[in-house]
A protein has these predicted regions:
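Predominantly extracellular beta-rich ligand-binding scaffolds that present long acidic/polar faces
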Residues: 1-193
Length: 193
């Protein structure tokens, strides 16, 4: 789905998404995009459980479990594997994150290549917007790269074992519930099974 001027709510992808080939165009950020769900001006309560695999030559690719570029992403999650071979950013929730909160990733995220970067939440955090109250379970970094002049926006991306209501207060909102099965917070709508 791609709809830059609209809102996407409660959408999901459960299938595998893959691309192998030569990317055309420029050789820098935002050249090519691949995601489990898609892109919109605003995305909420969306999720991906499918495997996302990208193998490229030339070009630069943003790859994300939910979205390739996040303008406003809230209450979304990814459980699928996200992998990039080539140049670009790979993120569990979003390839390039600009603004969003209360998202999580439990899928494995990898990026291989000279100019490839991976993050459990985002491959790249750009600008000075609010990115907070996100969590992940993997052993990687919260983001592959950050471009900003201040740090607090991203400081609340936590490993699940370190989450408290004090350091991620929004995760106790009406959208979340504790899962005994998973031993962590999950979304009430579009629940992780």
């Amino acid at each position: 789905i791609e709809a830059s001027a609209v809102k996407i709510k409660q959408c999901y992808n459960k299938g595998a998404v893959s691309f192998t080939g030569v990317c055309s165009g420029r050789d820098y950020e935002g050249d090519n995009e691949v995601a489990g769900v898609g892109f919109a001006a605003s995305m909420s309560e969306c999720y991906n459980t499918g495997k996302i695999t990208v193998n490229t030559k030339n070009g630069f690719t943003n790859v994300g479990g939910v979205s390739y570029c996040g303008t406003k992403i809230k209450n979304c999650y990814n459980t699928g594997t996200v992998s990039l071979t080539g140049k670009g950013y790979a993120g569990g929730v979003v390839g390039e994150f600009r603004d969003g909160s209360c998202n999580y990733n439990v899928g494995k995220v990898t990026a291989k290549g000279k100019y490839a970067m991976a993050g459990e939440i985002a491959g790249y955090v750009s600008g000075e917007n609010t990115v907070s109250d996100n969590y992940y379970t993997g052993s990687g970094k919260k983001s592959g790269r950050e471009y900003t002049s201040w740090v607090p926006y991203q400081s609340k991306a936590k490993k699940v074992s370190s989450i408290t209501s004090a350091n991620c207060p929004k995760l106790s909102s009406k959208y979340w519930t504790y899962s005994g099965k998973h031993k962590r917070l999950i979304l009430k709508n579009n629940k992780e099974v």
